[in-house]
Swiss-Prot record:
Binding site for Mg(2+): 121
Keywords, ordered alphabetically: Cytoplasm, Glycolysis, Kinase, Magnesium, Metal-binding, Transferase
Major place of residence: cytoplasm
Catalytic activity: beta-D-fructose 6-phosphate + diphosphate = beta-D-fructose 1,6-bisphosphate + phosphate + H(+)
Site (Important for catalytic activity): 148
Naturally occurring in which organism (per UniProt): Mastigamoeba balamuthi (Phreatamoeba balamuthi)
Cofactor: Mg(2+)
Entry's localization field: Cytoplasm
GO cellular component: cytoplasm
Pathway annotation: Carbohydrate degradation; glycolysis; D-glyceraldehyde 3-phosphate and glycerone phosphate from D-glucose: step 3/4
Site, as annotated: Important for catalytic activity and substrate specificity: 122
Gene Ontology terms for molecular function: 6-phosphofructokinase activity; diphosphate-fructose-6-phosphate 1-phosphotransferase activity; metal ion binding
Protein name: Pyrophosphate--fructose 6-phosphate 1-phosphotransferase
Amino acid sequence: MVKTVALLTAGGLAPCLSSAVGGLIERYTEMSPETNIILYLNGYKGLLLGEKVLVTPAMRLQAHVLHTVGGSCIGNSRVKMANVADCVKRGLVKEGQDPRQVAADQLIKDGVDVLHTIGGDDTNTAAADLAAYLKAHGYTLRVIGLPKTIDNDIVPVRQSLGAMTAAEQASRFFQNVVAEQTANPRVLLVHEVMGRSCGYLTAQAADYYRAQLAHREFAPELGHTRERYDIHAVYVPEMTIDLKAEAARLRAVMERVGCVNIFLSEGAGINDIVAEMTAKGETVPRDPFGHVKIDLINPGAWFGKQFGGMVGADKVLVQKSGYFSRSAPANAEDLRLIKGMVDLAVDCALRGEAGLIGHDEERNGVLRAIEFERVKGAKAFNIDHPWFTHLLNEIGQPKGAKVSVAHGDE
């Protein structure tokens, strides 16, 4: 019997977190109503500080509402327990304490049998490490993770929770913002999309955007042309960018159409920006995981500055869809995916299994509990997907060479 389970969400937001929490509460209420459910607040921070809520009968009745909610109803944080100095600095543990021991003591104190972690590869492998640590100290904890990341970059998971919704929302964001190219002559409009080292979100958002564009009605005689509302370039970290060649191609677009619209993954060209900052002796801001804080170095503005003059733009406008996209509630496709994974997660918990729930690309796409030792991040977006190749051909953009990218973020 599983007496007590605990849930936490961690890493960046994605359009699945609240729904997954609600789904787990609903499924346990259905399959094992006697099981106690603990919600650790604000991710691993709450676990380390003992900040938690015990789910009440009234809360169970309200769980269905969470399927319509964005963000994380129980809060998130970015905490790397292996980074002891950062944990001490933030007041999560005291000097001389091991964060793993502090977390383990809290789980033992709370009598947790199963820990459900909803996050990316860092979140879930950290939980697996914690379970191994507890086992070595004589306490059995099963960890069952759910794969959350808008980058869809977890190996070997076919589709992570929230990524489809985030791409749809990025497309929706640009459906409004694209009209800004009419505010001034010769506008270079850069849509900066989240994606540290994976171009999935940028590419999928571009594909979704062009799909809806095909069904829109235009009035070319009145200046409302499809070309002005189309995408003229898509840049992702996994593909090289020949700046000079692209500038020449897009300058021709500017002369013909009167504007240039670009979908740019924030991770595209990040190495060039970091190298430039380092050469100037500037400090590159990083988070507790060692990842570059992309929002502070502003890739879109850097790219626009490099490109604006080359394409003959009178105005450069950079618009970021990241927070708009990742904070949305899950769409219908993601809700179906969440339901399937949540149901299996609870079933696995009650059967005594552990692992990261997902469609295993290395096991014929079967939905199963994937062994944690096989889980890792930085799954690159495949630029050779037929649909992406078709997209590039449609907009007249030559495909660049493949690029190996560094480990991503949640």
